[in-house]
Amino acid sequence: MTILVPFYTKTNFINFIIDALSFDEYDSVVELGCGYGQNLFKIFYNGGGVNLRYFGGEFTSSGVEMAKKLASIEPNMRAEFFHFNHLKPKFDKNLDFGKRVLVFTYHTIEQVKEIPDNWFKVVASIAPFVRCINGEPFGFQIEDLGEVSKEHRKFFIKNGWNLNFASTLKKANQNGDIIIEDAMLEHSCGTDPFNPTSIAVWRSV
């Protein structure tokens, strides 16, 4: 089956993060699973500004190294990159994120077969106030929205990709570790109709 998706229907997730930053005051923005930091650089150059601090957690040492090199070219960007493993989430105590932090992930948990039960609790504890926006494909874990959801589930099972994001998120909310603020099972119409993005917005207690 072929579905042609016009480019103009594509929703830019980074603009979504920039908008979120404009609705509240934050000391820093943190991306977990940042690769070489391209999303953080886009945020900086498209409205994030110089007063915000930028942090990127990445599993690969090459990604962390490249992000640091790129950040060193921009003297006005206060950026710091560090190792982060979704399977064993922890943060160095020397990392100072400030008092109010916006965290986000974007299709980085999708290939982690199972995140641990404490993932949300650990992330929520990095600052006095944490809001997190997860842009991950988890809608099919909650509800069958049609043929795409069915194929989506089959694809993830075949590849050994994540199947427990939604259940772990619900448990964290039920346990009082976090407060879920909003969620969308499918986020508009991306250019990849067979791997649609879902969005979860939650904050620390």
Locations of the language-model features?
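A short glycine-rich, Lys/Arg-flanked "PGG" loop and its adjoining helix->strand segment in the class I
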Residues: N118-V130
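Conserved alpha-helix/loop element of class I SAM-dependent methyltransferases that forms part
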Residues: L4-E25
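Class I SAM-dependent methyltransferase core
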Residues: E31
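A short SAM/SAH-binding and catalytic strip from SAM-dependent methyltransferases
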Residues: V101-I115
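Conserved Class I S-adenosyl-L-methionine
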Residues: E147-N173
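Conserved beta-strand signature within the Rossmann-like core of class I S-adenosyl-L-methionine
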Residues: P128-F140
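Class I SAM-dependent methyltransferase SAM/SAH-binding core
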Residues: Q38-K88
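Conserved glycine-rich SAM-binding loop
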Residues: G35
